[in-house]
């Protein structure tokens, strides 16, 4: 999968982990609030992080704690 997003947030939700991803910049300008493209749910944190690393650079991944 090609890296094409620059915003990613992993948050726990009940018994799953939700990965939200999208765009944080537009034509070189940083947006005040990121544009969410989609989200996916995974059963474990390891699977969520593995997916996130495929679609965004590692420094763009933000994790939320319970």
What are these regions (language model features)?
Residues 1-31, 58-66:
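Short N-terminal "domain-start" leader segments
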Residues 26-50, 55, 63:
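A short, exposed loop/beta-hairpin motif centered on an aromatic-Gly-Thr core
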């Amino acid at each position: 999968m090609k890296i094409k997003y620059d915003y990613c947030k992993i948050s726990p939700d009940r018994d799953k982990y939700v990965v939200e991803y999208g765009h944080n910049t537009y034509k070189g300008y940083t947006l005040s609030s990121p544009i969410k493209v989609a989200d996916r749910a995974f059963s474990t944190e390891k699977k969520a992080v593995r997916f996130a690393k495929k679609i965004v650079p590692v420094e763009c991944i933000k994790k939320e704690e319970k």
